[in-house]
Amino acid sequence: MADNMTTTQIEVGPGATNATINFEAGILECYERFSWQRALDYPGQDRLHRLKRKLESRIKTHNKSEPENKRMSLEERKAIGVKMMKVLLFMDPSAGIEGFEPYCVKNPSTSKCPNYDWTDYPPTPGKYLDDIEEEPENVDHPIEVVLRDMNNKDARQKIKDEVNTQKEGKFRLTIKRDIRNVLSLRVLVNGTFLKHPNGDKSLSTLHRLNAYDQNGGLVAKLVATDDRTVEDEKDGHRILNSLFERFDEGHSKPIRAAETAVGVLSQFGQEHRLSPEEGDN
């Protein structure tokens, strides 16, 4: 299975979440206009309603992390999203949005290129994704948890017990899922813990998340460059969905991979990075 498997990589840069939300709001506006023409079939109407619900939820969460003067409503984002489409479809810089100038990527000499950081976000100098080492950085006294053939409730409790020994600061955690001596899941996490006055701990920064298949091949790598926090509200859920699908293809009890990952992420307060379907498992 590992021979034909490619590694999926994501690099998180500033502004990408905002731009994506605005773009999807523009798509929603197009869906709604199409619906007003009575040209949208029933599956299309269903997609329209689901997209609207997801966007409203995502905007609400994202706005909490934004300064008050940068918070925008769905309607405001729709207007920006439609302009973004004009830029993309017609390569028209006159319709340009601040921070969104794909025309400038091809024509950097043009005078209408004030800023296009998010479209061409530079990685850490000398640290392009393909150059970043596969293993997260080493830290003192890394935690390794091997979950042998046990039920998922016991597995989650063992993870919780091990994680609770972690002190404040950077950490590295390896989770292995061993069922009948078959290594079905391995997740390697690098991040930073904060310890609160009441004794609770939270994951303040997720620097890396590597996941491996049964044969030890790297399946997915989630990277936050320059120690930036992986942006809020489900930026990683698609990569995790893809990861679980690949595990599912090669294991007799695929749900264990998803359930174990739910348990791992829940210990760090990161359940929102899972899709609703995964969270229900």
Swiss-Prot record:
GO terms for biological process: symbiont-mediated suppression of host ISG15-protein conjugation; symbiont-mediated suppression of host PKR/eIFalpha signaling; symbiont-mediated suppression of host type I interferon-mediated signaling pathway. Changing residue 77 to A: Complete loss of dsRNA-binding and inhibition of IFN-beta promoter. Residues 1-103 are annotated as: G1P2-binding. InterPro entries: NS1, uS15_NS1_RNA-bd_sf. Disulfide bonds: none annotated. GO terms for cellular component: host cell cytoplasm; host cell nucleus. It is found in: Host cytoplasm; Host nucleus. A motif (Nuclear localization signal) lies at residues 50-55. It holds the Pfam family Flu_B_NS1. HAMAP family: INFV_NS1. Homodimer. Interacts with and inhibits human G1P2 conjugation by UBE1L. Belongs to the influenza B viruses NS1 family. This is Non-structural protein 1. The gene is NS.
